[in-house]
């Protein structure tokens, strides 16, 4: 689980990834500190190479919403994103989760493949629909965001 000590390194990781929105360094401190049970950080040789920020949806307690998935360039294509998501699903805090949701821009093919592949691996559905449009964002230049909803997630103890 991440700790507040990971916040700065997570910010640096996100800063390196062009297609992710870079939030304030303070926000990553909060994610790593206050949302550590629903987020994950992966280190290799002392460096942060992967991070997922997530939270239990306040209006849907059976849904884990994934805010960002970040994988360092040298680690891409190795299944690290899927591995991190599966590790999150194994946590006690997330035992009640039956669905994963995330918003993905149409140009973000790696995230599309990640969530579609996760649904296939979990042998469940992935429903994609419109969610935020470009006019919902301030100023110009932000793409639409589609909602990916994966589930229901069947666990070994409730099959």
Curated annotation (Swiss-Prot):
GO MF, any single term: diaminobutyrate acetyltransferase activity
EC number: 2.3.1.178
Metabolic or biological pathway: Amine and polyamine biosynthesis; ectoine biosynthesis; L-ectoine from L-aspartate 4-semialdehyde: step 2/3
Example GO biological process: ectoine biosynthetic process
Gene3D superfamilies referenced in this protein's UniProt entry, alphabetically: 3.40.630.30
Keyword Phosphoprotein tagged: no
Residue ranges of domain N-acetyltransferase in the record: 1-138
Superkingdom of the source species: Bacteria
Pfam families for the chain: Acetyltransf_1 (PF00583)
Keyword check for Transmembrane: no
Keyword tags: Acyltransferase, Transferase
Family listed: Belongs to the acetyltransferase family. EctA subfamily.
The protein's name: L-2,4-diaminobutyric acid acetyltransferase
Organism in which the protein naturally occurs: Virgibacillus pantothenticus
Origin organism lineage: Bacteria, Bacillati, Bacillota, Bacilli, Bacillales
Gene: ectA
């Amino acid at each position: 689980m991440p700790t507040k000590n990971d916040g700065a390194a997570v910010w640096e990781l996100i800063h390196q990834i062009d297609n992710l929105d870079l939030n304030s360094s303070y926000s990553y401190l909060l994610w790593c500190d206050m949302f550590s049970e629903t987020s994950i950080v992966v280190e290799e040789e002392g460096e942060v190479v992967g991070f997922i920020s997530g939270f239990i949806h306040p209006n849907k307690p059976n849904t884990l919403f994934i805010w960002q998935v970040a994988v360092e360039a040298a680690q891409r294509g190795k299944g690290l994103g899927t591995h991190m998501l599966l590790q999150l699903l194994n946590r006690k805090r997330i035992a009640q989760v039956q669905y994963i949701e995330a918003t993905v821009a149409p140009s973000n093919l790696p995230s599309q493949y990640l969530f579609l592949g996760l649904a296939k691996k979990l042998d469940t559905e992935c429903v994609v629909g419109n969610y935020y449009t470009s006019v919902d964002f301030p100023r110009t230049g932000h793409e639409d965001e589609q909602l990916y909803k994966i589930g229901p997630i069947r666990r070994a103890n409730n099959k």
